Amino acid sequence: MVEWKGDILAVGVTEKDMAKDDNSKFQNSILKKLDAQLGGLLSEASSEEDFTGKPGQSTVIRLPGVGTKRVGLIGLGQSASSAGDFRSLGESVAAAAKAAQASNVAVVLASSDGLSDESKLTAASAVASGTYFMSFLILKLTYAV
């Protein structure tokens, strides 16, 4: 994933995804692989910032010298199953992109367990909708000020 070339790789995570083993390594396979590619920066940052995957939580790490410039963890809460959960993810991604002045953003889920193919399409649509809405709102507020 780190090979992707862009401004922010945003990873939607649940509280369950953030569980770690006795060695402070992620139990989630996606986060474990990403953390290994980043030399442990993800687990270190999540511990330092007390990031647990709660709704509304986010942390963005700058990555010099790799494909993507930043990796962001966006909290989804206990589980992400409703369109509203994924719309909130999109809104958080748009806010992080605005703060980082990013123009190229990729969004992935740390786990999609329990999501049917149809649910994955609904989730993708909701993320896009939330991102678009928040981007529009940010632009509107910027020009209103």
Which functions belong to the PLM regions below?
Residues 1-145:
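Glycine-/small-residue-enriched capping loops at alpha/beta junctions
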